[in-house]
Amino acid sequence: MSVKNSFSGVLFCLILSSWTFALAQAPSGGEPEPKAQAMPQKVVVVLAMHGEPPNDFPKDEFGRFFALHARLHYAEGADEDLHLRYAALDAKIRGWPRTAENDPFHAASQRMAEQLRETTGLEVEVGFNEFCGPTIEEAIEKAVARKAEAIIVVTPMMTPGGIHAEIQIPATVKQARERHPGLSIRYAWPFDPSEVAQFLAKRIHQESQESN
């Protein structure tokens, strides 16, 4: 089995185990979790990726984008014009045409999604947290349009404490649940640290064997 196929298989196992781990770690008094049920007839996976800017996007516009981002982040009561300018640049960056040359991360994300499709037999939509389209919110809506009976959002960002995996993606999932109250939308996170360690240990072992 190739490293690529091995990774997709291990990631699928981590997806399923992280779902169980998240239930076990859920704090009391929080959102009530539904009782365990058999897997619905149609499950669609949303692969939530970080996203990278295209390397051929105009540098001056990208500089303005980050300057606006900083002003909006640190300034209180920023005016509507700043928000509109920022949103316009964000949309332009996300909508920029992608190729394997100008955005290798985007190409790799699509390959990972294809491997997940082959490994799980499930439909997979890719969404990006920043710099690239579609957004995770848009990917969830695409899954809804596929007539999903359940949506599982998963990310390869496995380390707790990061703002994307721990704060931003859960907020997006929460908003999606509010838009679709009758649909099961689950976030398969966090990952069990022991299983992440086992995955990394396997790669370490493979690398050490290849170097001998």
Description of each model-found segment:
Residues 10-20:
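Bacterial N-terminal signal peptides
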Residues 2-10:
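Bacterial N-terminal signal peptides that target proteins for export
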Residues 24-212:
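Active-site-proximal alpha-helix that buttresses catalytic centers in soluble enzyme cores
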